[in-house]
Amino acid sequence: SVEVSNASSLKVDSWVVLSVQNNDPAYVAEELKEGKVVAGELGPDHDINKNGVKVYEYHQIKSIEGNVVTFYEPIHHDVDVNYKNFTGNGSYNWKVMNYPHYENVGIEDLTFKGDCKSSFKHHGSWEDDGAYKPLGMTRLVNSWLRRVRFTSVSEACSVTNSSNVSVYDIIFDGKRGHSSIRSQVSTKVFIGATVDRSNGYLVDNP
């Protein structure tokens, strides 16, 4: 459960995003635990010290009592509002936001065929990384991708801003591309039972 300042706009059984973006140095250090940021390793858009810790959790509301909101499933991340508020780069402390989405979307029993570069080079060009990206699953809950073959694609599928999505019984073949299935800014995504039969360079073999 979380307590919000005003729960009047929230409804039972609706989906919301529990989110934070904060670059308080103490908060960044807590998030990284024993890890350290290597100067120059990432570009400015991915600098956690500048842009802050970003957390997005997607939840369905089970009950609302006053301003206390309880979700159907446990919260994954500690919600600590004691760190100072970060006000730069459009950031914010913990808050609950409405989450427009689609539900019960299934994609199955299909083949997606592309023609990605034979001499793939990681981040070599836009053609290497993304010329053939047939499928994206965005803002979905309780949805799935199964029994699908991806042939010679740059990136098979990205699951973004989604929750409770399953991806399984997937085959990759043909020419090897940039990536297969990835989950980004999502909660509770299962990716399993995938088989890679593609041919081509490995990431560490340019």
What label would you give each PLM region?
Residues 84-98, 121-136, 152-155, 174-183, ...:
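Extracellular beta-strand/beta-solenoid scaffold signature
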